[in-house]
């Protein structure tokens, strides 16, 4: 059986991009059980409540929901168990230092398969205040209206 090449997206955490200012991103491998991999291959996962914790020099992914494998038996995994992240030592140290110094948090952004291996994209992020969210929403709305006006103007020129 040949390995699939490229990147196959399983889940995205759109809420994280809305609730946080993303500063740095990292790609980490995941330590998974067999039924978790099979469930992910079915495209089933949720990153919404996920966060990363660094404990005794190891990075752990908490709150990510990978539902039980539908054809699994007694070997099925717990849906919300903590999962170990595979990062280089210097990456873990850098993340831990920045989280402790600047009050940042680490959130998962995307879960995907890359060359047959499950990966998670994590980000160092700073929480947005509610007025930040409203300002970002207003800016997106203004940009959308500008683009639509330009599009209508250009379309009128071609007719």
Swiss-Prot record:
InterPro entries: SmpB (IPR023620), SsrA-bd_prot (IPR000037), SsrA-bd_prot_CS (IPR020081). Keywords: Cytoplasm, RNA-binding. It is found in: Cytoplasm. One of its GO terms (biological process) is trans-translation. Residues 137-147 have a biased composition (Basic and acidic residues). Belongs to the SmpB family. Its main location: cytoplasm. One of its GO terms (cellular component) is cytosol. Residues 137-159 are annotated as: Disordered. This is SsrA-binding protein. It comes from Nocardioides sp. (strain ATCC BAA-499 / JS614). GO terms for molecular function: RNA binding. Required for rescue of stalled ribosomes mediated by trans-translation. Binds to transfer-messenger RNA (tmRNA), required for stable association of tmRNA with ribosomes. tmRNA and SmpB together mimic tRNA shape, replacing the anticodon stem-loop with SmpB. tmRNA is encoded by the ssrA gene; the 2 termini fold to resemble tRNA(Ala) and it encodes a 'tag peptide', a short internal open reading frame. During trans-translation Ala-aminoacylated tmRNA acts like a tRNA, entering the A-site of stalled ribosomes, displacing the stalled mRNA.
